[in-house]
Curated annotation (Swiss-Prot):
It catalyses: a nucleoside 2',3'-cyclic phosphate + H2O = a nucleoside 3'-phosphate + H(+); phosphoenolpyruvate + H2O = pyruvate + phosphate. It holds the Pfam family YmdB. SUPFAM superfamilies: Metallo-dependent phosphatases (SSF56300). A divalent metal cation 2 binds at E37, N65, H148, H173. InterPro entries: Metallo-depent_PP-like, YmdB-like. This is Phosphatase/phosphodiesterase DR_1281. It comes from Deinococcus radiodurans (strain ATCC 13939 / DSM 20539 / JCM 16871 / CCUG 27074 / LMG 4051 / NBRC 15346 / NCIMB 9279 / VKM B-1422 / R1). Its EC number is 3.1.4.16, 3.1.3.60. Belongs to the YmdB-like family. Keywords: Cobalt, Hydrolase, Iron, Manganese, Metal-binding.
């Protein structure tokens, strides 16, 4: 099973490069997962962004800590017709949507899970224990985990915690692709962060002036989505029998 995971789509430039580039490479993969956490102006995902990604060839959309920023997607989260997965480890049983979904990929089961980290982020249920509970099921097939977290240590800990128990643990949220792509013991693909899909000449997606002035003046400044050419980052994976046999960073930059 060949799976492409694409990191956090950021704003209109991220949506543009996704919708232009993904259709050209989609035939190379059996399934595509896209994190859409920042696709609507840098914060969350709205209905049009979701539809655009699905039309481009995405088979599943994941989210993160900005999942609730746009209320127009709340009904979509709870409809099986929309393959969207929000973070699993929210305590409230009335939280819209689901934290995992299982897909049929050419006759094989692929389960996509979305988790939130807790270090330097808002309080949510323990992602390690939440994942342990899910893995008590025996009907998940090949399991892919999008771990949306800030701290490298927490992401690495999750990778080792799930080594040999899932097919992949790929981090999102920090927007910079890391060079630690590998296969952990037991056949679990791991990368601390897939990187983002958005403006290339930016500060993790934002127009340079706002963040730069904040550092220079130590005062708040307005942030906006940067313009210009965009990049697309992700991880290309190969799974066999519920295990990863290959993992490679994927990167494309517009001319």
């Amino acid at each position: 099973m060949r799976v492409l995971f694409i990191g956090d789509v950021f704003g209109q430039p991220g949506r543009r490069v996704l919708q232009n580039h993904l259709p050209t490479i989609r035939p190379q993969f059996d399934f595509v997962i896209v994190n859409m956490e920042n696709s609507a102006g840098g914060f969350g995902m709205h209905r049009d962004a979701a539809r655009g990604a699905l039309e481009a060839g995405a088979g599943c959309l994941t989210l993160g800590n900005h999942a609730w920023h746009h209320k127009d997607i709340y009904p979509m989260l709870s409809e099986d017709t929309y393959p969207i997965v929000r973070p699993l480890n929210y305590a409230d049983p009335g939280t819209p949507g689901v934290g995992w979904r299982t897909f049929d990929v050419n006759g094989e089961k692929l389960t996509v899970v979305n988790l939130l980290g807790r270090v330097f982020m808002e309080a949510v249920d323990n992602p390690f224990r939440t994942m342990d509970a899910l893995l008590e099921r025996d009907d998940l097939g090949t399991v892919f985990v999008d771990f949306h977290a800030e701290a490298t240590s927490e992401k690495e800990a999750m990778g080792w915690h799930l080594a040999g128990r899932v097919a992949a643990v790929i981090g999102t949220h920090t927007h910079v692709p890391t060079a630690d792509t590998r296969i952990l013991k037991g056949g679990t693909a791991y990368q601390t962060d897939a990187g983002f899909t958005g403006p290339h000449d930016s500060i993790i997606g934002s127009a340079i002036e706002g963040p730069l002035q904040r550092f220079l003046t130590e005062r708040p400044h307005r942030y906006g989505v940067a313009e210009g050419r965009a990049e697309l980052n992700g991880v290309a994976l190969h799974f066999e029998g519920g295990k990863a046999t290959a993992a490679e960073r994927y990167r494309f930059i517009e001319d």
